[in-house]
Amino acid sequence: NTIDESLRANLIALRYKPSASELVDHYILECTKENKEQAKNRFFVQGDPGAILVIEFAREDREEIKAITDKVEAEMRAVGLGYHFPVLYGEDSKKIWTLRKAGLGLLSNLPGDAKAVPVIEDTAVDVNDLPAFIRDFNEILKKHGLYSVHYAHAGSGEIHLRPIINLKTKEGNALFRTIAEEIATLVKKYNGSLSGEHGDGRLRGEFIRQMVGEKNYQLLKDLKQTWDPQHIFNPNKIVDTPPMDTMLRYIPGQQTPAFQTIFRFHNQDILQHAEQCNGSGDCRKTHLSGGTMCPSFMASRDEKDTTRARANILREFLTHSNKTNRFDHKEIYEVMELCLSCKGCKSECPSNVDVAKLKAEFLQHYYDANGVPFRSKLIGNYSRLSGLGALVPSLYNFAVKNSFTGSLIKQIAGFNTKRSLPTLYKTTLKAWFKNHTAHANAGSKGKVYLFCDEFTNYNDTEIGITTVNLLEKLGYSVSIPKHMDSGRAWLSKGLIRKG
């Protein structure tokens, strides 16, 4: 039920020599509920625990695994630790580790400006001291009215700790330093390491002197001076590190405007949505990695074509632009240009950064300042143009498929001449439906309303016809209600007011 219980249970688990013992707290578990990809991976969670402990055993067969897990469960229950002990194998166990791995990105989903910040996330102590250390850690945070995210390597005494602080405020900025100083002293008390897994760098380099002592720190300085007297290689990371709060992304107290957007961003504004990107780089996948995100990066292998780059450039200009219309920057347009609006990031990005939505919103404001390109108007009016073509579909299809006229149309419209243009079906779905005779079985089981978008109506009409016939044979009467166009063409080109 609590983090403390999980850490005490961890000590029991370690006696059985697991291959891994990892902590995931309730903050991350709550974030998984709002993430489409990770919501599927939390199937084993029962109730709303304060934390879960994921223990992995690798043995020769399942019988041996079961014998160990039965002993671990019995010992934990005997001392009142834990209430649900699912044992998972194979593909199901992979889902747990996928959820655990996504923890860092999921933390960006916390609503508002207060975020889980990596100020002291790498502390490590002797695993037997871990429960007491975390209790002391949380007492310090409680004193300052703060809470923290806890996750990761319980089995090795190295829990990632991220206090939730609003770095955009002067108060939050001051707390950032205060927490770093007080936790560094606490780690020293437990003879631990302030950077148990990753480097010290600009964030924790300031505290190396305190961690290793004056004599050892001087040895580090002498070593640096001997082999790199000009401080060429990675300067100011281990020795002579500047104060940890002098190079922050946000200027404390800096005011950002209230953005009037056409889309609604749930519990946040557009800047806060862009700020959800924490730079984890899940969008830098190749086609061999599986998944969709991000197709433009898979093709170009250029950082500017990643989900991360698009979120970052929008965040930068919305925060620091001097223009009244902060979207009016060619640099943003160039980075957004190759986004396919495939929505892969909406489900696969652990931080749920929806670049397709961000791009559409950006384009509308950019067009407000710079006008709408002819090609975008053409695509936006796809339904109207298809309606005109549907009056004489055979003539339309001849024009777009003929090498001369088709090439001319593409050049005028601004399409690549190698691309094929969509053709029209011989009739529209709505016209066919109006004249067709319903199946004798239709209506025996009820009624279905079929919403016919412009693409099904004009292009993929056979799919619509097959759907109607199938539903009627299954016993449903079908009705196609009058409704507006889907607006997808307008939205895809950023003309969201029309969409």
Specify the residue positions occupied by each region the protein language model found.
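Iron-sulfur-cluster electron-transfer modules
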Residues: 110-114, 323-499
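Phosphate/adenylate-binding glycine loop and adjacent helical scaffold
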Residues: 200
